[in-house]
């Protein structure tokens, strides 16, 4: 049952207090990708710091869960760019 509460908490905004830990995890993983791929992706997460600061004052469950989703999508896209699966103009040929 604890797992269900964790999942529901994401959509209720209960896990939003851990967004800083989530951001640090994404930065660390991005740094590791940059280390092994030669792509310095760690600096691109600086824009999320201000976004997170603004988002922390808003208590809307849809906004809180969307923050996690957006950050995860950006991390995945940057990972694909780091490994050169996709380029800045789309899928590499």
Curated annotation (Swiss-Prot):
Chief place where the protein resides: host cell
Membrane topology classification: Multi-pass membrane protein
Name of the protein: Putative transmembrane protein ORF25
Alphabetically ordered keywords of this record: Host membrane, Membrane, Transmembrane, Transmembrane helix
Subcellular location: Host membrane
Segments traversing the membrane: 1-21, 22-42, 60-80
A single cellular component GO annotation: host cell membrane
